[in-house]
């Protein structure tokens, strides 16, 4: 009888270990030769993210973490169907610039830290917000359309964002990212917010953003909202950097 109990206990422990292992998140790090090849040669107007700047016909820039998390992204299109980074999108980068006061849109892919999260080199830079001129914003999605939970990712501000906001933010100003999760029918399943600037103070280091509250989703879109406006619209640059996206494996 004792042997039977021991066998049953061993089976239970093994099953528990298997379950825990299956629930360990898979991390999208943006590291490796595939991702290095997706970093444009210049931060603004480069061939990868903008294509032919004279013709303005767009580019086929996209990425797909095919053998890992299954996440993918493409650039947003304008009214003519041209996919260009200024319409919104997710760009791989390794640019660093700590002199934020001198950073403008030509340094849009740089961050003021020593590199990606946890000592890595690469990261991803989001551009885009929903407004009267732009009905879409950058997004990531699971290419196989199978819903998964994004547990968290790590966020920091870009050098361009800080170079602008540090000069204009008052003690009451704020900027936030609104992440919206969608199912396979493009129906909203959840939202989550993260403040890049709050009470006039902006983050300048990698900070964890828990996203599991979105639940299982197929796509997550990132919208930038801010209290800092003028007569033309939002003046806070609609950018943020992120890294180490943790995805719970599909069951």
Give residue ranges: language-model regions.
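Short beta-strands within extracellular/lumenal beta-sheet-rich domains
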Residues: 128-149
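Short, solvent-exposed loop/turn segments at conserved positions within beta-propeller repeat blades
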Residues: 132-133, 170-174, 233-235
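Buried hydrophobic residues that stabilize the cores of well-folded domains
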Residues: 29-44, 105, 162, 176-187, ...
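Leucine-rich repeat
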Residues: 142-143, 167-169, 209-211
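N-terminal targeting leaders for non-cytosolic proteins
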Residues: 23-134
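Extracellular ligand-binding interfaces
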Residues: 146, 154-199
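Bacterial Sec-dependent N-terminal signal peptides
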Residues: 1-6, 11-38, 249-251
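Terminal, low-complexity interaction segments
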Residues: 177-251
């Amino acid at each position: 009888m004792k042997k039977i109990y021991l066998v049953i206990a061993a089976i239970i422990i093994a099953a528990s270990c298997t379950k825990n292992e299956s629930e360990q998140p898979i991390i999208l790090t943006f590291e490796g030769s595939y991702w290095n090849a997706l970093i444009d040669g210049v931060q603004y107007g480069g061939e990868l993210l903008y294509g032919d700047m004279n013709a303005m016909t767009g580019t086929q820039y996209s990425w797909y973490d095919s053998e890992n998390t299954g996440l993918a992204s493409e650039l947003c299109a304008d009214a003519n169907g041209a996919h260009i980074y200024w319409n919104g999108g997710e760009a791989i980068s390794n640019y660093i610039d700590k002199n934020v006061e001198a950073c403008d849109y030509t340094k849009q892919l740089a961050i003021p830290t020593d590199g990606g999260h946890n000592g890595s080199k690469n990261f991803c830079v989001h551009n885009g917000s929903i407004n009267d001129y732009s009905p879409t914003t950058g997004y990531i999605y699971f290419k196989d359309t199978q819903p998964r939970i994004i547990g968290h990712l790590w966020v920091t501000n870009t050098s361009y964002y800080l170079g602008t906001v540090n000069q204009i933010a008052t003690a009451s100003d704020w900027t936030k990212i609104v992440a919206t999760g969608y199912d396979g029918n493009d129906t909203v399943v959840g939202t989550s917010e993260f403040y890049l600037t709050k009470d006039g103070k902006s983050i300048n280091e990698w900070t964890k953003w828990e996203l599991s509250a979105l639940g299982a989703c197929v796509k997550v879109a990132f919208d930038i909202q801010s209290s800092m406006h003028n007569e033309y619209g939002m003046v806070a640059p609609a950018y943020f950097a992120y890294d180490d996206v943790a995805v719970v494996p599909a069951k």
